[in-house]
Amino acid sequence: LPAFTLPGPVARLGARLQRVYSNRYVPMIRPDGTPADSISDAALRDSLEDWLLPYLGKVSRLSHFASLDLSAMLAALLPWPLPQRLDELAPKSLSVPSGSRIAIDYSEQPPVLAVRLQELFGLAETPRIAGGRQSVLLHLLSPARRPVQVTQDLASFWANTYAEVKKDLKGRYPKHYWPDDPLIAEPTARAKPRR
């Protein structure tokens, strides 16, 4: 099946599983107490008939494969209640103070949340996943989505580094909102907050 590739969705789901259902957080166990199998490219390719066949009813040409929701199909392979726990402990995305939902990259350790700096105004602490046991690594981005700072301690960034970063960003992006106190400022996904 050359047109049907597994790596993208498999890698993303596998990374989320690895980050959460490791010994550090929650063991990956079936409800009956037996260990759950891992999902790998090889195992999925070897068992295509078992898990893919039920979804092929409306596929009549190769281009239809692109419309299949591999993430949902792979999540359905997990024993209950692992899919629900996975969404609780390792969400695909987090809501930030601006109201945006930002995808989490689980291919890195710790997982990375790349977000524009202005969208975090008003947030005092680094967002956490895995039931509060794991801080995400924040890649703070400029309005042009270029990295300006990497931190796992947002409180320290606001207290110690923000003023310096603000000077640089204010010079490069003068039309954007750069408050003196980011903890009481209104978060925004725009150049300036709405009035």
Which sequence ranges carry the predicted segments?
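Acidic, serine/threonine- and proline-rich low-complexity intrinsically disordered segments
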Residues: 1-93, 133-195
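Amphipathic alpha-helical packing elements
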Residues: 86-117
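Short conserved micro-motifs at the rims of enzyme active sites and ligand-binding pockets
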Residues: 106-107, 125-126, 147-153
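Short, surface-exposed, low-complexity cationic segments
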Residues: 107-136, 140
